[in-house]
């Protein structure tokens, strides 16, 4: 793409204004950024330019949602404006923040609208009818000591939904 930068071993920057630094990273969408080792910013299953303004930093992180951010190790921010930090966390609701270790995903509203705001329950002062979804989660799942990634037992210590409900 135009104005892309790829510095390092086997890095790819595709999509206008994308930057890829480190080793074996992919910056797929428009204005996406990767740094570290084996990270992906953008939705590689879609055309170049989809899921723009995503950032993936660290080791084996994925930021595939539009304007999403993932960092640290083996984290995934897969919905729009979502953030995943820690070890093997997944942020799969609109605007969600997942921190900690190996959280349980698939809770709330995991519908993805890559270009608009269909995944959020409250727009233009009106409730849309969508599930309020998860705003914040702290994962406290196990770690697979042989891989250093999340194990087979994901778990959540704390969940806050957009409607204000909290679960311990």
Model-predicted regions and their roles:
Residues 1-168:
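Periodic small-residue-enriched repeat registers in elongated scaffold domains
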């Amino acid at each position: 793409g135009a104005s892309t930068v790829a510095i390092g071993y086997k890095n790819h920057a595709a999509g206008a204004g994308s930057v890829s630094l480190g080793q074996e990273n992919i910056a797929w969408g428009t204005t996406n950024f990767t740094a570290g080792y084996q990270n992906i910013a953008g939705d590689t299953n879609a055309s170049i330019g989809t899921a723009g303004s995503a950032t993936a930093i660290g080791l084996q992180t994925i930021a595939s949602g539009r304007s999403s951010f993932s960092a640290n190790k083996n984290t995934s921010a897969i919905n729009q404006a979502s953030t995943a930090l820690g070890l093997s966390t997944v942020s799969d609701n609109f605007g969600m923040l997942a921190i900690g270790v190996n959280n349980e995903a698939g809770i709330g509203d995991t519908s993805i609208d890559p270009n608009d705001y269909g995944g959020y329950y409250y727009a233009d002062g009106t409730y849309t009818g969508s599930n309020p979804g998860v705003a914040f989660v702290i994962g406290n799942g196990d770690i697979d000591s042989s891989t250093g990634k999340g194990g087979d037992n994901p778990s959540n210590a704390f969940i806050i939904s957009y409607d204000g409900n909290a679960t311990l």
